[in-house]
Regions:
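Residue-level preference for the first positions of well-ordered beta-strands
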Residues: 5-9, 32, 70-72
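Short, charged, surface-exposed secondary-structure boundary motifs
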Residues: 43-44, 99-109, 128-130
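Glycine-rich phosphate-binding loop used to anchor ATP phosphates in small-molecule kinases
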Residues: 49-102
Length: 138
């Protein structure tokens, strides 16, 4: 990789395993993990309206600027259009649950349409799915 991060967007409902997977991916492949909850807390913006969610999307997209190596974005990213706009090199849909504990997020979340990997069950073997996807170019 040269002068630019390889961005992996882990999208899915709250509780689908995004954070756990991001931590495992960083441990195996290196890079950085950017957690949407931590970004929201740093901004002290707890508005979950459509406008608040869009602001969070913009913060998450900006969080990759200036980074190198693998960057794992751990983010619900509820709207298909936003997932496309993120500019991620790899989109992983964590489709492990159908309903989260947050009714407002359930309503806002659009089932992923464009993705590179779809994870439907969470197990240790799933890490091998990334072996041919996360290759550092010299």
């Amino acid at each position: 990789m040269k002068n630019r991060a390889f961005v992996v967007l882990l999208t899915g409902l709250p509780g689908s395993g995004k954070t756990t997977l991001a931590k495992k991916l960083v441990k195996k492949y290196g890079g950085s993990h950017i957690n949407a909850d931590e970004i929201r807390a740093a901004a002290n913006d707890w508005d979950f309206s459509a406008e608040g969610r869009r602001r969070q999307f913009e913060r998450m997209r900006a969080s990759t600027e200036g980074k190198e190596g693998f960057v794992f974005l751990d983010f619900v990213c509820p709207v298909n259009e936003w997932r496309d706009e993120m500019g991620a090199d790899l989109i992983v849909w964590m489709d492990t649950i159908q309903i989260s504990r947050y009714e407002d997020t359930n309503k806002a979340f659009e089932r992923a349409v464009n993705y590179d990997l779809r994870i439907t069950s969470f197990d240790e073997d799933m890490l091998s799915l990334f072996d041919d996807k996360l290759i550092i170019e010299q």
